[in-house]
Amino acid sequence: LDANQHAAFERFIRRGGGFVGVHSASDTEYDWPWYGALVGAYFKSHPRIQPATLRVVDGTHPSTVHLPVEWKRVDEWYNFRDDPAAHGRALLVIDEKTYSGGTMKTHHPMAWCQEYDGGRAWYTALGHTIETYGESLFLEHLLGGIRWAAGIAAD
């Protein structure tokens, strides 16, 4: 994005707009600190695609209310430069004991949300593989995040 597009996006959020970030949304715009703060964390690295266990830490959020407490699935598991929950609300964490290549130790958020600069931001690190978009639990997770970011109450 150029400077005008940055300004327009910032204006949108400051006027109460919502942002939804999926997977690689944390792996872009490294020279735009406002965007990094909106997303909540920047990508650091990832191991190979493999199975792992996710744990819901906030089962009241529209993006997690339908999920099992423990959710086993296959994806590309991102490590982040900083703890995304430092400024936001962790919704889903990954158990680093269930796969190889995690670098964040005991608290490794994979989905989170926050009120930011007048608007709302929701992010999920899930969604690398095409198969993910055929999984009903993932699609409900994504829809819940979209609805929350848009300020739409759940049905």
Predicted regions and their residues:
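Short alpha-beta junction capping motif
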Residues: 1-29, 118
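Non-transmembrane alpha-helical segments in soluble domains
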Residues: 10, 36, 64, 143-147
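Structural recognition of the beta-strand scaffold that forms the well-ordered cores
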Residues: 13, 18-22, 89-92, 113, ...
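Sec-exported extracytoplasmic/periplasmic mature domains
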Residues: 14, 18, 40, 147-151
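Histidine-centered active-site/metal-ligand motif
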Residues: 23, 46, 128
